Amino acid sequence: MKILDRINELANKEKVQPLTVAEKQEQHALRQDYLSMIRGQVLTTFSTIKVVDPIGQDVTPDKVYDLRQQYGYIQN
């Protein structure tokens, strides 16, 4: 992952010497991009979850169904 490698490179450099203003801005932008990707992955994972009780009935929370609809996994 190029973004994560660059984030780590800047973090290691920051431990040795102060970052320039441009490097700080790059670091902030990279971190925001990385967090956005992770959030997207988590939402995708949660939107495909199905919760079943011990009896075998689907008890998936409505919020998960809303996520599925929002991301196009189901159609109403």
From Swiss-Prot:
According to the record, the segments passing through the membrane are: none
* GO cellular component assignments: cytoplasm
Question: What SUPFAM superfamilies would the database entry show?
Answer: YnzC-like
- Main location group: cytoplasm
Subcellular location, record wording: Cytoplasm
Q: Which UniProt keywords apply?
A: Cytoplasm
A Pfam family (short name) is DUF896
Which lineage ranks, top first, belong to the organism behind this chain? Bacteria, Bacillati, Bacillota, Bacilli, Bacillales
Q: Which domain of life is it from?
A: Bacteria
Q: Give the similarity note.
A: Belongs to the UPF0291 family.
> What protein is this chain from?
UPF0291 protein SAV2573
Record-linked HAMAP family: UPF0291
